[in-house]
UniProtKB/Swiss-Prot annotation:
Keywords: 3Fe-4S, 4Fe-4S, Electron transport, Iron, Iron-sulfur, Metal-binding, Repeat, Transport, Zinc. Its cofactor is [3Fe-4S] cluster; [4Fe-4S] cluster; Zn(2+). Residues 13-60 are annotated as: N-terminal extension. Residues 60-89, 115-143 form the 4Fe-4S ferredoxin-type domain. Zn(2+) binds at H31, H34, H58, D117. Binds 1 [3Fe-4S] cluster. GO terms for molecular function: 3 iron, 4 sulfur cluster binding; 4 iron, 4 sulfur cluster binding; electron transfer activity; oxidoreductase activity; zinc ion binding. The keyword Zinc applies. This is Zinc-containing ferredoxin. The gene is zfx.
Length: 143
């Protein structure tokens, strides 16, 4: 798990209106059966500095801002339907992800941390547990 103090950026909560803002959050691709928005686009962190990644927002009804996500894993622990997996560790979930990313590696430069992937987005029961537990508010549930 990554500590906020160790980051070289300041996470900003997911834009609650991203679905209504096609200009800033256009659908740029698909990943594991869900839409990806703003991938490859430079966005700013809470300090107004460019995020070190350009990974975008993954999902629609269960959306995770991958530029903000710090791989805490709490969302996975509280989800009653297990809709999340680690992107770099398919099939794995929960805190303390198994796949450690070394600083300076190719994966580090691309992702910075593993990412919480809403691979079973359609299974969501809209309990909002993941949204409420995320320490950086990277998740937005839209029923």
């Amino acid at each position: 798990m990554v500590k906020l103090e160790e980051l070289d950026f300041k996470p900003k909560p997911i834009d609650e209106h991203f679905l209504e803002n096609d200009k800033d959050y256009p659908v740029t691709g698909q990943h594991n059966g869900h839409d990806v928005r703003a991938e490859g686009m430079q966005r700013l962190d809470a300090d107004g500095k460019p995020y070190p990644t350009k990974l975008g927002i993954h999902g629609t009804h269960v959306a995770v801002d991958w530029d903000c996500c710090i791989a805490d894993g709490a969302c996975m622990d509280v989800c009653p339907v297990n809709l999340y997996e680690w992107n770099l560790n398919p099939g794995k979930s929960g805190t303390g992800n198994d796949h450690k990313i070394q600083k300076g590696s190719e994966e580090w430069n691309k992702y910075r941390t593993d990412k919480c992937d809403p691979v079973r987005e359609s299974d969501c029961i809209f309990c909002m547990a993941c949204e409420s537990v995320c320490p950086v508010r990277a998740i937005k549930i839209t029923p």
